[in-house]
Amino acid sequence: KIGLAHLNSETGLKTDNLSSQLSQHYSFQTVDLSSPINADIDVYLVSGAVDSLDSLVMDNLIAIMDSGKKIFLTQSGILTDIKTQQANPIDSDIFSFLKDHGIILKQNLVLDGKSSKVQVQERRGIFMMNRPMDYPFFPIIQSFNKDEIVVSDLEQVLPFFPSEIQIDTASIDRVAGVIELFKSSSNSGLMEGNYILSPDPQQ
């Protein structure tokens, strides 16, 4: 059984598309991580935090990991808004939780030459026209681990504003092993510090 949880208290959990996909093969329910853990749930799909966590939520995340159950966490190091073209590092204790389990999520953004496009308005005479432009902050992932069933049948994934992940296998004894599921292309790079989110370099 799968539990869907949301760490961002400022926005609601939007699961319509995900729920329709999961319902074809799995039993699932939304869960509140500030409430007692449901022993029937084997895997938790958890959306990312944008602020520090309630102590009950943190205690439950630790208890879930210590019990041997699994957490699939979608977390970025940077809070972004494409409409205002603003980006700021996220200040949250979720990063210390991840680091305690050997995962170092960097506060940067991954860019990739193989990316999706966004529509940019430009003036042509008296008219405003939409023009598609490559947007490297939306990398197109096409490199998957074919030996892992969770991603082996995927053809493409499009993450929005992903951050770099480093795995500490030396100093953390909780890391039994690391399996790479997918990765960006060889044309990828990083943006740190001064975040320029405009898709049009002339703006």
Identify the function of each model-found stretch.
Residues 1-2, 10-11:
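N-terminal non-catalytic structural scaffold regions of very large proteins
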Residues 4-6, 75:
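Short beta-strand/turn micro-motifs composed of small residues
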Residues 11-203:
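Acidic, S/T/G-rich, low-cysteine, solvent-exposed domains in lumenal/extracellular/periplasmic regions
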